[in-house]
Structure formats: structure tokens, C-alpha cells
């Protein structure tokens, strides 16, 4: 699937300066769908400054600026949770939680005499109406399963917020640059 959301942790050049090239590449690929950019307050101003070299795009850009220490943003099928981390500028980490539906219960489908041609549609959440019956996903699907969680943070000192937000993550990505004790002062800058 094409990229339709980009989350920015903060606006230091090494984290955002590649955006114009990415936008131009998307435009050259004939993208027309909107692109949502999420990041700390000031995102619109920063991106508009970078767009001097990519002013005309065949798709709209939407902005979501974060101001609170924590945000939860629901989308169809997944959720993004943003949380502040400890950097020398306002900086966010992100958790992406992908929802997972329950398992298809073959025995229930067979017991209800649901024709096989409807099974995959029911698994995808579709309700099937026939002249004789109405079949709904809840008739054949088990309870929702635990979602898949990815947590990402960068350019931060250790914080309780990271521990809290990375809890139960299936994948935790955290960049670290200054691990040696003699570079402790550099890490605090």
C-alpha cells in the first residue's frame, strides 16, 4: 500500500530534510490521494518552508500538529499514540497499534449452514444479505485478538514515558547514539 501518513518526531534536519524528495517522488508516481503529516506544533510552517523546492504536487497534504504531551489518534484498523520524549527540542515517540480481528470459526459457519462462498467476505467484516438470510461477521468470528504494536522513539534520554509506551510492544525501535560513559555530557546536550 502507498504511504499515506508520515509521523515526525521533531524538526532537526536529519529527521525532516528528506521530505521534499519524498514528496516529489510521490508526485512523480502520479499519487493523487491525500498525505497526512503528523508532528509537533509548527509542522505546517516547517513543511511549507521545505516545500519551496517542491511547491506543486498532484495531491493534497493534510497536517496534524501535536501540542499535548500525549495523543491518541484512531484510524480505520489502527491507532497511533504519540508521546513526548526528552530531547533538547519538543520531540515525540510513536506507538502504532494494528487491530486484529478474531479467528474465523469454521465449526460455527458449518453449523449455521453458511455457504462457503460467503466465508471470506464475512472474515473481512462484510454483512451478507440473501433473500433467505442475513449473515453477519459476529456469527462466525471469534473475539478480537491482541493487536500488533510497534513503538519508535529517537534522540531522547531515558524516560518513564518510553517505558510506559513501549510496554507490550511487539517491536521497539529506539535510536541510541551516546552509550559510552565518557560521552554522557554530549548526550545531555
Regions found by a protein language model. Give the residues of each.
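Short acidic-hydrophobic surface loop/beta-edge motif
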Residues: 70-75, 128
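A gly/proline- and charged-residue-enriched helix-loop-helix capping module
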Residues: 42-51, 63-68
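Active-site neighborhood of phospho(di)ester-bond hydrolases with catalytic His/Asp-centered motifs
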Residues: 3-12, 39-40, 150-156, 173-175
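Active-site catalytic pocket residues across diverse enzymes, especially alpha/beta-hydrolases
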Residues: 23-26, 51-54, 98
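Binuclear metal-ion centers of metallo-dependent hydrolases, dominated by the metallo-beta-lactamase
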Residues: 68-70, 158-189
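Active-site metal-binding motif and surrounding structural segment of the metallo-beta-lactamase
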Residues: 1-38, 62-70
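Hydrophobic packing residues within well-ordered alpha-helices of enzyme cores
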Residues: 19-22, 47-50, 162
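Active-site-proximal loop/helix segment associated with metal-binding centers of metalloenzymes
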Residues: 78-152, 156-165, 171-173
Amino acid at each position: 500500500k502507498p504511504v499515506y501518513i508520515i509521523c515526525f518526531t521533531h524538526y532537526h534536519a536529519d529527521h525532516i530534510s528528506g521530505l521534499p524528495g519524498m514528496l516529489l517522488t510521490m508526485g512523480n508516481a502520479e499519487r493523487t490521494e491525500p498525505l497526512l503529516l503528523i508532528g509537533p506544533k509548527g509542522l505546517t510552517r516547517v513543511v511549507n518552508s521545505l516545500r519551496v523546492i517542491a511547491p506543486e504536487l498532484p495531491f493534497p497534504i493534510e497536517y496534524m500538529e501535536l501540542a499535548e504531551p500525549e495523543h491518541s489518534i484512531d484510524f480505520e484498523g489502527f491507532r497511533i499514540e504519540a508521546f513526548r520524549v526528552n530531547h533538547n527540542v519538543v520531540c515525540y515517540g510513536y506507538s502504532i497499534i494494528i487491530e486484529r480481528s478474531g479467528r474465523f470459526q469454521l465449526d460455527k459457519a458449518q453449523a449455521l449452514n453458511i455457504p462457503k462462498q460467503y466465508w471470506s467476505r464475512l472474515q473481512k467484516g462484510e454483512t451478507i444479505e440473501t433473500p433467505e438470510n442475513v449473515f453477519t461477521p459476529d456469527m462466525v468470528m471469534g473475539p478480537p485478538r491482541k493487536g500488533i504494536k510497534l513503538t519508535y522513539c529517537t534522540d531522547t534520554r531515558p524516560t518513564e514515558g518510553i517505558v510506559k509506551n513501549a510496554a507490550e510492544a511487539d517491536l521497539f525501535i529506539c535510536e541510541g547514539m551516546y552509550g559510552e560513559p565518557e560521552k554522557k555530557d554530549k548526550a545531555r546536550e
